[in-house]
Amino acid sequence: NILKKRSDLNAIGFLSESGYEENITWNDLYKKVCKLSAYFKTLSLKKGDRVAAYVPNKIESIVSFLACAKNGIIWSSCSPDFGVQGVVDRFKQIKPKILITSDHYFYNGKKINILEKINKVLEEIPSINEVLVFSYNKKEKLNLDNFKDFDEVLNQSELDETFERFEFNHPIYILYSSGTTGKPKCITHGAGNVLIEHNKEFMLHCDIRDGEKLFYYTTTGWMMWNWLVGGLATGSSIFLFDGAPVYPKIDVLLEYCQNKKINLFGVSAKYIDHLKNEKYNSKNLDLSSIKIITSTGSPL
């Protein structure tokens, strides 16, 4: 359902707070998902197995999630700002066979290493037997010893265009409760339910149509990331931002909306409150493309 569209137009756009940008077309997204799903099969990953992802909000994260969904593998992700214990508390419960991660990410002007945490995670989760790593910046070559290079795996894999049908309620991903009352609790979502609910919310509630542009500021550890990915099923393009929402300047997200002519813009209530408290005025930006702003996470 998400990969049904074929086009040389962009399906996903990505911007880092560092200024680094990437895009992927619908056609290339389809090919990468099919190649990664083929690789998963070589590892004997099967329907119902779990893949854990400790990843920034990048295109590779979505490719990985969709490859899992294609094979009936259950996805679960944490954002890299989670500490080792936070990751272990979540992933240890689901006994993943593979961990997907990146070499680093950026936040508030700092380049933060992710790989230095991975060995500690592996010590606590013995079910993980392979780690797949993608480079945050394609201009920077990975230097890996015991882990697999994401791009090399894709380049060497066959194009598997077989799509197996699964039960309507077959699990597509595992999310988690906040962990404020004990350890985070697993919340499993069924694929059919998610697809129908997200299509309803995008197309009926938000009036989103094929070819429009969706941007929600989120991390891979928040349910709004999963929601945003669901927007691809409408034929809309989605846009990702990785980093602090007000770095390198207070209106970096709004400027992104202007430059990409975003139609749906989603943020947390805290972000809107921050703009209000700073008395920010967007009069120097052209935000006329935005037809709906959504907010969640706390009362506005």
Each PLM stretch: what is its role?
Residues 8-10, 132-133, 145-176, 183, ...:
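Conserved pre-ATP/AMP-binding loop-to-beta segment of ANL
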Residues 2-25, 135-142:
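AMP-dependent adenylate-forming
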